[in-house]
Curated annotation (Swiss-Prot):
Organism superkingdom: Archaea
Catalytic EC class: transferase
UniProt GO cellular component terms: riboflavin synthase complex
Physiological role: Catalyzes the formation of 6,7-dimethyl-8-ribityllumazine by condensation of 5-amino-6-(D-ribitylamino)uracil with 3,4-dihydroxy-2-butanone 4-phosphate. This is the penultimate step in the biosynthesis of riboflavin.
Name of the featured protein: 6,7-dimethyl-8-ribityllumazine synthase
The encoding gene: ribH
Catalytic residue list: H82
Length: 158
């Protein structure tokens, strides 16, 4: 899949509706930060929960007009290890999709093992970091793909 011109970065955002009092604020922060960075959010897709993200992320990664995907969610600790299972399996699958499609999928999912209060404290940090990481990775992947390593050595990409 080809990525767009470096000056025009197009993102998709997938946001969980579970714990929406938190994730709706994460979405607002992510959209504001994307605008601040000068990148375009082509589509926002809401899914029931973080565990449900992978199928939507995969569909977005298939599209040439999407350079990377930001995921936003909050997996709050409960009475069982359910939060750990959800967070671990979701992160693993999202990383697998990123590698499979050669496009960044960034993890703006708070948790596991956090309380509601801890998640609220992390809204801004996780949202902004997920967008920033996607933009940095897209730019660096583009540079890496343009370099002819048969002709250049000691290359540093930042």
């Amino acid at each position: 899949m080809e990525m767009q011109d470096q000056s025009k970065i197009n993102l998709g955002i997938v946001v969980s509706e579970f714990n929406y009092d938190i994730t709706s604020l994460m979405l607002q922060r992510a959209l504001s930060h994307a605008e601040f960075l000068g990148v375009t959010v082509k589509v926002v897709v809401k899914v029931p929960g973080s565990y449900d993200m992978a199928v939507i992320v995969k569909e977005l990664l298939k599209r040439d007009e999407i350079d990377g995907v930001v995921t936003l969610g909050a997996v709050i600790k409960g009475e069982t290890k359910h939060d750990e299972i959800v967070a671990t399996q979701t992160a693993r699958k999202l990383m697998d999709l990123s590698v499979e499609y050669g496009k960044p999928v960034t993890l703006g999912i708070i948790g596991h093992g956090v309380t509601h209060e801890q998640a609220v404290e992390r809204i801004e940090e996780y949202s902004m970091r997920a967008v920033e990481s996607a933009v940095k990775l897209i730019k660096r992947l583009k540079k890496l793909r343009e370099i002819d390593l048969t002709k250049e050595t000691n290359v540093s990409i930042e």
